Design a protein with these regions (language model features):
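N-terminal pre-domain/capping segments
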Residues: 1-127, 131, 163, 228-235, ...
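Active-site acidic/histidine proton-transfer and metal-coordination neighborhood
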Residues: 93-233, 243
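A short acidic (Asp/Glu
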Residues: 57-61, 92, 142-144, 192-196, ...
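Well-ordered, non-membrane alpha-helical segments in soluble/globular domains
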Residues: 24-33, 61-68, 151-167, 198-208, ...
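Anion (oxyanion) recognition and catalysis
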Residues: 73-76, 256, 334, 361
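Active-site beta-loop-alpha junctions enriched in small/polar residues
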Residues: 14-16, 50-54, 84-87, 135-139, ...
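Flexible, acidic glycine-rich loops studded with aromatic residues
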Residues: 261, 304-406
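Acidic/histidine-rich catalytic cores of soluble enzymes
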Residues: 171-319, 327, 336
Length: 407
């Protein structure tokens, strides 16, 4: 839905299963009208669409796309952002690090992303900008042998991303919408934090991209740099940045310093807890985390020590090291409901969301806001509610924080 500050708020449909377009469309028809009725009954409701590769191929067929556009019009809904991170199965299967497959070293990722942008261009309301979030190049733990291997991966993935940028520039120059690819750092991705995003942008994307666009379009270096900044932005997933103990002020200040933009704010919360020195008290905390140990998604844990951070690739590895006396705090990658602040002896990083939304309210830094709690299906039973009620409650909570009515 469009808010009074002209930004748009939605939720990501990766919450709904369905890897084929027909299955996912059935989910949208089941839940979107109820959510809209609850949070935006009299105004158009925006959708944050997630399509698997299979679904994107099916929706690209003229008949399917026409049917979807007609449904959107009938329901007074519109699509303004997409989630292009998970390519394949995302529900009822073991996802773990396969969420990065295929990564940006492959042409499959390029073709999938370009296809999504063509669909988004066909769906966007006239005059509205669009964005698609994507994986942070690759999974870092696949490329740990040497620095030269990592550098080669960074170069290959960047050149592939520039193929997408070329298409976005062409679409816009030919009268189509302005759209941006929103890179989403996350723990153990090739980009995990603001500094790694900046290092990539300044040392790979711009140096490779400026001559690439100069050659493709006959434009100046300054025009090429501007095009890159417009078409490649940051997807600021609040959960992911909270996991690496970064404040919103730090993230936004560094981006502003280098003239970079936030294409999408993904509103999500992680689990956290102090790790007490007392063995019995610590064991209660560890037992609480153990309740969230499930086999579908990666639940990276980043522990805070007095002298830095300690990374565990998944919750089981952290549980094995639970007695480490140097560890003062755990934060675990588990998108929990944003309206819940505590889970027994565990807390959420909801305060990080409150801080970033306060900054958005004071001085808007993005037009796209998307709630992304995709783990409803694997949450402990006591946290599960009917899907439409859960989504509506999350969106309502965000609106309260923003103190902005629908426009």
């Amino acid at each position: 839905m469009q808010l009074a500050d002209h930004s748009h708020l939605t939720y990501c449909t990766n919450i709904h299963p369905g890897e084929s377009w027909s299955a996912h469309f059935e989910q949208l028809k089941q839940y979107i009208p109820a959510v809209k009725q609850e949070v935006s009954p009299d105004k158009p409701f925006g959708i944050g669409l997630r399509l698997s590769n299979t679904a994107s191929l099916e929706l690209s067929k003229e008949e399917a796309l026409s049917e979807f556009k007609a449904w959107l019009e009938t329901q007074e809904c519109y699509v303004f952002t997409m989630n292009g991170f998970p390519y394949g199965g995302f529900h009822h299967t073991v996802v773990k690090d396969h969420v990065h497959t295929p990564d940006w070293t492959t042409s499959d990722r390029v073709l999938y992303t370009i296809r999504l942008f063509r669909l988004l261009a066909a769906l966007l309301p006239e005059g509205m900008e669009g964005g698609i979030s994507t994986a942070p190049l690759s999974y870092k733990l696949w490329h740990v042998r040497c620095e030269s291997e990592q550098a080669a991966v960074m170069e290959t993935t960047t050149l592939h991303i520039l193929q997408v940028v070329e298409q976005l520039v062409r679409i816009h120059r030919n009268g189509g919408p302005s759209m941006h690819l929103d890179i989403e750092p996350e723990p153990d991705g090739m980009m995990e934090n603001t500094q790694e995003f900046l290092d990539w942008y300044l040392h790979y994307l711009l140096p490779l991209g400026i001559p690439f666009l100069e050659d493709k379009f006959g434009i100046s270096a300054e025009e090429a740099a501007t095009a890159i900044r417009n078409h490649v932005q940051l997807c600021y997933d609040v959960c992911h940045f909270a996991l690496v103990y970064e404040s919103a002020e730090n993230v936004l200040q560094q981006l502003k310093q280098h003239g970079l933009k936030v294409g999408k704010l993904q509103i999500s919360a992680a689990l956290k807890a102090a790790m007490p020195e007392d063995a019995a008290t610590r064991e209660a905390v560890v037992d609480a985390f153990r309740e969230f140990n499930e086999p579908t998604y990666l639940h990276q844990v980043i522990a805070r020590k007095d002298d830095g951070l300690l990374h565990y690739p998944d919750l089981p590895q952290a549980l094995e090291d639970a007695g480490n006396p140097a560890v003062k705090e755990w934060r675990s990658h588990f998108h929990v409901p944003v309206f819940v602040g505590t889970f027994g002896v565990l807390s959420s990083t909801r305060s990080d969301i409150e801080q970033v939304l306060q900054l958005q309210r004071k001085q808007p830094f993005t037009q796209h806001l998307e709630v992304e709690t995709y783990t409803w299906g694997v949450l402990p039973a006591e946290l599960k509610l009917p899907m439409d009620r859960s989504v509506s409650r999350e969106l309502g909570w965000v609106l309260q924080q923003l103190e902005l009515p629908a426009r």
